[in-house]
Amino acid sequence: MNKYTASVVGGSGFTGGELLRLLTQHPYFEVVQATSRSKTHKTIGNVHPNLRSVDLRFTDPSELESVDILFAATPHGVSMQQIESFTAAADTVVDLSADFRLNSAEQYDEWYDGHACPEYLEDAEYALPEINRSNLVGASLIASGGCNATATILGLKPLFDADILTGDEQVVVDVKVGSSEGGAGGGDASSHPERSGVVRPYAPTGHRHEAEIEQFLGLSVSFTAHAVEMTRGASATCHVFPSEPVSNSDLWGAYHDVYAEEPFMRTVAGGGGVYRYPEPKSVAGSNYAEVGFERDPENHRLVIFSAIDNMMKGSAGQAVHAANIALGIDETTGLEFTGLHPVGAP
């Protein structure tokens, strides 16, 4: 079996570790390089204890090898500075940061601090495979969607496809996220004594993932993010106010039409048992996303739920999913793990 050679730039962070976990078990990828400025020459297992069996050491990112595909798991701002060296080293580049998710330099001026290489934005394909799979086939520069944006878009998109929403309605989104979203260098707010027991609003307004949601869905959302005491996970609760009454069968039909054939989507709405709605714990460690809904006819409101593992469906898993599609590999390859139950705090 011919394998694609792969490198992971920024392999010492949480997301880099998830990429290495997935890629070293993937039958069509051979990881030949993982880079880290801070962990150069250390073994992969020294940094990621679950990968102690991986016989590879971190190298300096200035020493990129030529590979078939390069995954960049670097903080925002790094990939845009290094994109020329990335594209010179690899035929396909998958970037997990926000550096190529938006379409224009003007958007980066508004939401970030500008863009160092705006000429690359036109060629970048935003990766949310359930929604824009065809755009990823053969793509050479892929921008993996942000975790909060992914959860929100997956929850809301079927309502647009079914004309339940048009883009003129009020949409309020409340996302609760785990500490791993802050990365391995998350700072004081992510340390255990400060994080333990909290439900902390950290982006009441102006969260940068709003830009991805608005770009993809074509509507303005009122978005608030809370940090909560879990390690993995993003749980989005979306309150929408459609102009016309919506029945339960309308909702089931909308979500069935979009997601029934999707290998990593599960619709969970009511029913019996403990897990009656989407919950991050149910998808921890997997590339699955769960979506669900509840009607509130008295207040002309729909409550839409979405749950993902922020480091998998919201990052590394989505990146590998997109890479599979780009290279013509069966898209579920290397991503079949369904999660664990029971499991402790994710």
Curated annotation (Swiss-Prot):
GO biological process, one term: L-arginine biosynthetic process
Top-level class of the enzyme under EC nomenclature: oxidoreductase
Catalyzed reaction equations: [amino-group carrier protein]-C-terminal-N-(1-carboxy-5-oxopentan-1-yl)-L-glutamine + phosphate + NADP(+) = [amino-group carrier protein]-C-terminal-N-(1-carboxy-5-phosphooxy-5-oxopentan-1-yl)-L-glutamine + NADPH + H(+); [amino-group carrier protein]-C-terminal-gamma-(L-glutamyl-5-semialdehyde)-L-glutamate + phosphate + NADP(+) = [amino-group carrier protein]-C-terminal-gamma-(5-phospho-L-glutamyl)-L-glutamate + NADPH + H(+)
Localization annotation: Cytoplasm
CDD domains linked to this entry: AGPR_1_C_LysY (cd23939), AGPR_1_N_LysY (cd24151)
Listed GO MF terms: N-acetyl-gamma-aminoadipyl-phosphate reductase activity; N-acetyl-gamma-glutamyl-phosphate reductase activity; NAD binding; NADP+ binding
Location (main, coarse): cytoplasm
SUPFAM superfamilies: Glyceraldehyde-3-phosphate dehydrogenase-like, C-terminal domain (SSF55347), NAD(P)-binding Rossmann-fold domains (SSF51735)
Enzyme Commission code: 1.2.1.103, 1.2.1.106
Pathway(s) of this molecule: Amino-acid biosynthesis; L-lysine biosynthesis via AAA pathway; L-lysine from L-alpha-aminoadipate (Thermus route): step 3/5; Amino-acid biosynthesis; L-arginine biosynthesis
Entry annotation: catalytic residues: 147
Example of a GO cellular component annotation carried by this entry: cytoplasm
Sequence segments annotated as region (Disordered): 178-198
Binding site for NADP(+): 12-15, 310
InterPro entries: AGPR_type-1, LysY, NAD(P)-bd_dom_sf, NAGSA_dehydrogenase, Semialdehyde_DH_NAD-bd
Superkingdom, natural source: Archaea
Keywords tagged on the record: Amino-acid biosynthesis, Arginine biosynthesis, Cytoplasm, Lysine biosynthesis, NADP, Oxidoreductase
Record's keyword annotation contains Cytoplasm: yes
Keyword Oxidoreductase: yes
Pfam families in the record: Semialdhyde_dh, Semialdhyde_dhC_1
Protein family per UniProt: Belongs to the NAGSA dehydrogenase family. Type 1 subfamily. LysY sub-subfamily.
Function: Involved in both the arginine and lysine biosynthetic pathways.
Name by which UniProt lists this protein: Putative [LysW]-L-2-aminoadipate/[LysW]-L-glutamate phosphate reductase
Organism expressing this protein natively: Haloquadratum walsbyi (strain DSM 16790 / HBSQ001)
